[in-house]
Amino acid sequence: MGKFLATLILFFQFCPLILGDYSPSCCTLTIGVSSYHSKPCNPAQPVCSWTLDLLALSADQALQPPCPNLVAYSSYHATYSLYLFPHWIKKPNRNGGGYYSASYSDPCSLKCPYLGCQSWTCPYTGAVSSPYWKFQQDVNFTQEVSRLNINLHFSKCGFPFSLLVDAPGYDPIWFLNTEPSQLPPTTPPLLPHSNLDHILEPSIPWKSKLLTLVQLTLQSTNYTCIVCIDRASLSTWHVLYSPNVSVPSSSSTPLLYPSLALPAPHLTLPFNWTHCFDPQIQAIVSSPCHNSLILPPFSLSPVPTLGSRSRRAVPVAVWLVSALAIGAGVAGGITGSMSLASGKSLLHEVDKDISQLTQAIVKNHKNLLKIAQYAAQNRRGLDLLFWEQGGLCKALQEQCCFLNITNSHVSMLQERPPLENRVLTGWGLNWDLGLSQWAREALQTGITLVALLLLVILAGPCILRQLRHLPSRVRYPHYSLINPESSL
């Protein structure tokens, strides 16, 4: 009877697991306030798949923009390619569990507030002890017009995880939080398919079309601004419509845009685009385009007017060079004198320490000699006691040991001259003219200052003459590429 009850208890314990292997399950995808269920996942092929509408995802973005002053384009821009995280980072804890963090870095190295931040990390809330996630090689996603297909492969169905998808060009990021659940009775409705028949492809590479974009920028500002392009991000985005962008007419400081949409309703398009985005109907149309170009971060500032000098600056340069030379010479002389004085004092202190160490070594050597004499005296006494047996060594049947203490090294240490006489502290010349040390150092400093002053007097006029004739040698070539009448 007891065996029957034990078998029955084990059957009821493992019955849900056995039945669960054959029952279909799916993953629920929560985005903001909406939930999306994946297709049924079975143990034979554990794959969770979603077909998501990008416009519905944009409407469900409940997070705040992650960066301050982030430029918001979600009200009038087209869809952009989505990027999943290329790798996962394992972060274990002390209890044997832990988290998986998904890490993503944008290849263009974008920084806030330019259309999103550079990198994001999101915790993976599954257990680390037995992870069923198979990392990046099992992530599959495609984008068809405004719909996104995501396929996540697992080694077992019904496992919770968290996923973060970053869409460059959108103001909020998407936090996709998934959890295992049973198949719902009815599939939640998605928004109807949008009329976005085409998406805007990324622009032609900058290697061949950068000059055309700069020309369009100059033409849109009527050739009154200087365009400075930041080479940190050499990539353009989409054709957008931004009628509220204004170019500064007169300003002392350039107006910096994190990303600028230049209005181009009456300009010839530099590239052949067959479809454009209409912000009024929120759709891609093939009618004449009234759009703009999105360029990387650059600054617009008025062209400065070059004024002629009213006075020559050569006397100022002469006085400036002379003052700098004299100041450098005085500072060098003072520094040299102080360094020589400090070197002398340092050598004196080191020599004093060496003499004390030498006295200590000599004293220890004398003590060692006394100990050796005491040992020899004891040895002679023991030899007399064991005279009949042939001495101490034969009585002990051991080899005789003798001391060999030399005094040559100690005598050489005592005969060495002082350290100040062995170290070269001056210029390597004999400056002993019957003067004191400070007088000799002052003489050396004066000679140095005179040499520097002579060098400035001899080489200064030649250098100033060359600098004066340098502006006349510079040529300003005229580039026809920025001519307003040139065709794009």
UniProtKB/Swiss-Prot annotation:
A motif (CXXC) lies at residues 225-228. Gene3D superfamilies: 1.10.287.210. Specific enzymatic cleavages in vivo yield mature proteins. Envelope glycoproteins are synthesized as an inactive precursor that is N-glycosylated and processed likely by host cell furin or by a furin-like protease in the Golgi to yield the mature SU and TM proteins. The cleavage site between SU and TM requires the minimal sequence [KR]-X-[KR]-R. The record marks 312-313 as: Cleavage. The chain crosses the membrane at residues 443-463. Pfam families: TLV_coat. A motif (CX6CC) lies at residues 393-401. Residues 1-20 form the signal peptide. Residues 376-392 are annotated as: Immunosuppression. InterPro entries: TLV/ENV_coat_polyprotein (IPR018154). Residues 313-333 are annotated as: Fusion peptide. GO terms for biological process: fusion of virus membrane with host plasma membrane; symbiont entry into host cell; virion attachment to host cell. Keywords: Cleavage on pair of basic residues, Coiled coil, Disulfide bond, Fusion of virus membrane with host cell membrane, Fusion of virus membrane with host membrane, Glycoprotein, Host cell membrane, Host membrane, Host-virus interaction, Lipoprotein, Membrane, Palmitate, Signal, Transmembrane, Transmembrane helix, Viral attachment to host cell, Viral envelope protein, Viral penetration into host cytoplasm, Virion, Virus entry into host cell. Residues 21-442 are extracellular. Residues 341-387, 397-429 form a coiled coil. The 17 amino acids long immunosuppressive region is present in many retroviral envelope proteins. Synthetic peptides derived from this relatively conserved sequence inhibit immune function in vitro and in vivo. The surface protein (SU) attaches the virus to the host cell by binding to its receptor. This interaction triggers the refolding of the transmembrane protein (TM) and is thought to activate its fusogenic potential by unmasking its fusion peptide. Fusion occurs at the host cell plasma membrane. HTLV-1 lineages are divided in four clades, A (Cosmopolitan), B (Central African group), C (Melanesian group) and D (New Central African group). This is Envelope glycoprotein gp62. It comes from Human T-cell leukemia virus 1 (isolate Caribbea CH subtype A) (HTLV-1). The lineage of its organism: Viruses, Riboviria, Pararnavirae, Artverviricota, Revtraviricetes.
